[in-house]
């Protein structure tokens, strides 16, 4: 690897504090060499926020770094080890096709993981080729950037490069590498891994590292590991509520895809719901609906219980006391989630203050939407219109009854009607990454090499709360189909 190390002024300021952990947590590994990398897409706003050099990154040397052909001098590429419950079944995992180059320290002192996804085989590849296809990498780029614009914590996509290789999946597909940026890649599955195969001291080392990386206030607490558990529960309660509020279906909420930082990660089989239905499932492998839209809060609770189990040796010297502490902490999730969800739903309806009856008002609207197969995003968007009478949402009599109750509710707050409208417009996106529009962009890019469709889509998705006429095209529903939209993990 030494001959591939280079000094190129990309602006990357890399450290790798993760390698200070015991070696059970990672394996040092070089990326595979790529025959003819070409830049497909580069995230200029993210480059600016990270303090990187766009001109160098889009040069031949920069593209070689994004492809893994050249390695920044200060980088220590590693594949991270972790485990996870996949559809409820525990298994050993790890980075099977990704390498962490290091942690970039921004000019403001913030720390972000820089990871190459699709960079070749690792000791954790489990028989896979370690490669990634262009379509799924572009899809992650689109969805993660849309999530960021919606204000939802997420990993980001810095770039996608094509590799010049063909890889075999369901067919022969063009290869690609995505550069992912994350607060960290520490997962519930990382803790599960060390809990199963490591020592208590190695578990403590990971917990202490996580506190130092994400929750420094925990050091001053009487029980820092309880603080760690509570903070992760709070972050996940906020995150899952935000997913539900925009109709996002993750599709593969395995414990290895739940981050400790509270960011959304892994955009393989995800999609946004069109017609409101709590049983919405997009993933082709989720045949029993374990990860359906309406079940996401329950699965989050289940995942957090698995996280709490890993911390038992650190929570209390007495195992029975440790279990009680963990159970009490996890039981808080439901209330925390519901408070976040209700607060977000009130905002979507222009409600500033709290009343006990609000939940009934919200549930009544959702029930009507479900009954009439209404589009989730466009229904809330229509409620922001001044002339809502011109928009036929459901059965007129049923909707009029609900609408009257809603208008009466708005009178029981001090804020003016204009303020309510502004709150609604800032809480209800006019555009989301509609599945048919995403597929349209991917088909043009992958099959025709035309990235203009994707660029226009990304531009619209970058301003989801603008409510402009230009976004009307992206808010239109797909044509009715007898075949439901399905997603695939892309691996």
Curated annotation (Swiss-Prot):
EC number(s) stated in the UniProt entry for this protein: 2.7.7.-, 2.7.7.108
Family to which the UniProt record says this protein belongs: Belongs to the SELO family.
Residue positions binding ATP: 94, 96-97, 117, 129-130, 180, 187, 266
Record keywords, A-Z: ATP-binding, Magnesium, Manganese, Metal-binding, Nucleotide-binding, Nucleotidyltransferase, Transferase
Name of the gene this protein is made from: ydiU
Pfam families the UniProt entry points to: SelO
Keyword Ubl conjugation recorded: no
Role of this protein: Nucleotidyltransferase involved in the post-translational modification of proteins. It can catalyze the addition of adenosine monophosphate (AMP) or uridine monophosphate (UMP) to a protein, resulting in modifications known as AMPylation and UMPylation.
Cofactors that this protein relies on: Mg(2+); Mn(2+)
Uppermost EC category: transferase
InterPro entries hit by this protein: SelO
Organism: Clostridium botulinum (strain Kyoto / Type A2)
UniProt-annotated binding residues for Mg(2+): 257, 266
Active site residues according to the UniProt entry: 256 (proton acceptor)
Protein name as annotated: Protein nucleotidyltransferase YdiU
Catalytic activity of the protein: L-seryl-[protein] + ATP = 3-O-(5'-adenylyl)-L-seryl-[protein] + diphosphate; L-threonyl-[protein] + ATP = 3-O-(5'-adenylyl)-L-threonyl-[protein] + diphosphate; L-tyrosyl-[protein] + ATP = O-(5'-adenylyl)-L-tyrosyl-[protein] + diphosphate; L-histidyl-[protein] + UTP = N(tele)-(5'-uridylyl)-L-histidyl-[protein] + diphosphate
Superkingdom classification of source: Bacteria
GO molecular function per UniProt: AMPylase activity; ATP binding; magnesium ion binding
